[in-house]
Curated annotation (Swiss-Prot):
Compositional bias per record (Basic and acidic residues), positions renumbered to this chain: 218-229
Family statement drawn from the similarity comment of this UniProt entry: Belongs to the Di19 family.
Record region (Disordered): 185-230
The protein's name in its UniProt record: Protein DEHYDRATION-INDUCED 19 homolog 3
Classification via Pfam families: Di19_C, zf-Di19
Length: 246
């Protein structure tokens, strides 16, 4: 059953490749006799070679319909996404030759998606750095627009972000670091010094002050209060200047 499956897959791949080049009649049946002879000679080596032939036949190089550069199916999709996202003029599809007006990449992925699954495993291709940056900038622009337009969804997004942070230990460590910095900044903030009049109002009079005040005249008491006020003002200014310089 496996050998019949590989034989039929190889035949279908070769027919597709021949149809692309316009030589269906010349290429019909080519490779079938070779596969059968290899199956009779040896099993394991035949399977490896058959897989390589199938992969080569399944992924033929096709030309870009806009700049005519040769690519396989995977790299062609990456090339169209990066260099030809929206083309104004009509161009034929390099696979089915149907005339496509704008989005060639969407047509290939929707109409010819079977090409990515025809082999035993799908080929992986690296996304170019410029394409990755363009996708990232597009996501950032979308997030910015949602932040500007979606006023009613801000609370929901903040709740979702808080849930994601609590679920991710790395993000939660960042959150703890920010909270620690916030608490340190609060501790370094200058402490407001109360007014001198409020100090006099809140602080009860000491007994020795009452004895001194009783032994002084009214003018001397007024002079001592003035001196104490000047000293308090000077100390207050000195403390504030020291805090602001730090």
């Amino acid at each position: 059953m496996d050998s019949e499956h590989w034989i039929s897959s190889l035949a279908a791949a070769k027919r597709f490749y021949a149809a692309q080049l316009g030589h269906v009649d010349d290429m019909a049946g080519i490779g079938m006799e070779e596969v059968e002879m290899e199956m009779e000679d040896d099993g394991e080596g035949m399977e490896l070679e058959l897989e390589m032939q199938l992969e080569e036949a399944t992924w033929p190089d096709v030309a870009c319909p806009y700049c005519y550069e040769d690519h396989d199916i995977a790299s062609l999709c990456a090339h169209l996404e990066e260099d030809h996202p929206y083309e104004p003029h009509t161009s034929p599809c390099p696979i089915c030759f149907e005339k496509i007006t704008r989005d060639m990449l969407n047509h290939i992925t929707m109409q010819h998606g079977y090409l990515f699954k025809s082999g035993r495993r799908m080929r992986r291709f690296d996304i170019p750095e410029s394409q990755a940056l363009s996708l990232l900038s597009r996501d950032l622009r979308d997030a910015q627009l949602q932040a500007l337009l979606g006023g009613g969804h801000r609370q929901r997004r903040s709740n979702t972000t808080a849930t994601n942070i609590s679920a991710d230990p790395l993000l939660s460590s960042f959150g703890l670091g920010f909270s620690t910095l916030d608490s340190e900044e609060r501790s370094k903030a200058p402490v407001p010094i109360p007014d001198d009049t409020s100090i006099h109002k809140d602080t009860p009079a000491q007994p020795w002050e009452s004895r001194i005040d009783s032994s002084l005249t009214s003018e001397e008491r007024e002079q001592k209060r003035k001196q104490a006020t000047d000293r308090a003002t000077f100390v207050q200014g000195l403390v504030l200047s020291t805090l602001f310089e730090d």
